Amino acid sequence: MMESGEALLKKLDGRLSGLRGRLTPDTGMDKITWFRAGGPAQVLFQPSDEEDLSAFLKAVPEEIPLLVVGIGSNLLVRDGGVPGFVVRLSAKGFGEVEQVCDTQLRAGAAAPDKRVAAAALEAGLAGFHFYHGIPGGIGGALRMNAGANGVETRERVVEVRALDRKGEVHVLSNADMGYAYRHSSASPDLIFTSVLFEGVPGERDDIRRAMDEVQHHRETVQPVREKTGGSTFKNPEGTSAWKEIDKAGCRGLRVGGAQMSEMHCNFMINTGNATGHDLETLGETVRARVFENSGIRLHWEIKRLGLFREGEQLEEFLGKII
């Protein structure tokens, strides 16, 4: 069982006294994630700005676990909670989007994807319309090479600013990010703080039309008004995850309060009282049934964090294909 957040802060007494951000022990992650499920963060830290984050990283011993989350759209938190520190970048210090020249935007890692799309529209820059349909933040988009409608984040990135676990600044080029489908090979220890994007000059009416099409498509085929984390699984090569899920008979499948959406069966939803364990068990059950039906191994697109609650674990037959 995880010790209390107060106990962790007491161990670090004095080390964190100069921070300007907010330290909150034993914070329910269900208040942060879009699934509205899961256990607590031992300590949640919300830095004021990059300088404050750097000071925090320099003060916290590297043996203490540390995880970074964005706006919580693609996170599944287990019910036993997340040990150590969870760092959440706030919109106040990391959420700005500004035009820096005719074709470039700089965005903080906590900026919602939609805000970047809106800023690009205002600047008359094409190539960012796909962000209008992604329910997430830029930090997560950089980490997973988020994309939609045939466009990916890597197509717009010039360079990414990040801090390492020692609080030192790094600037990564597009090549340094090592992008592939829904993946970046950049060190998982790096915390992205901002990005420089490159767009293409375009007509605002055309950009707005593309954004409207993205929004219409999303509202038509995705359960946007449900408690969901977005696409659950990555698309396998040569097919779509939802098609394989549907063929395996998993559309509408339920475990406890968790359900594969009837509207789009690659979306898991919390119907009201789902636990993190319900959601993960449902996802693993779907993976097992798809593998049994077609031999295809689905890979999670949603990031799973934390510890199982005492006495809980995934069913043995499911663990064989994790």
From Swiss-Prot:
Its cofactor is FAD. The keyword Cell division applies. It catalyses: UDP-N-acetyl-alpha-D-muramate + NADP(+) = UDP-N-acetyl-3-O-(1-carboxyvinyl)-alpha-D-glucosamine + NADPH + H(+). Pathway: Cell wall biogenesis; peptidoglycan biosynthesis. The keyword Flavoprotein applies. InterPro entries: FAD-bd_PCMH (IPR016166), FAD-bd_PCMH-like_sf (IPR036318), FAD-bd_PCMH_sub1 (IPR016167), FAD-bd_PCMH_sub2 (IPR016169), MurB (IPR003170), MurB_C (IPR011601), MurB_C_sf (IPR036635), Oxid_FAD_bind_N (IPR006094). Transmembrane segments: none annotated. It is an enzyme of class 1 (oxidoreductase). Signal peptide: none annotated. One of its GO terms (biological process) is peptidoglycan biosynthetic process. This is UDP-N-acetylenolpyruvoylglucosamine reductase. It comes from Brucella suis (strain ATCC 23445 / NCTC 10510). The gene is murB.
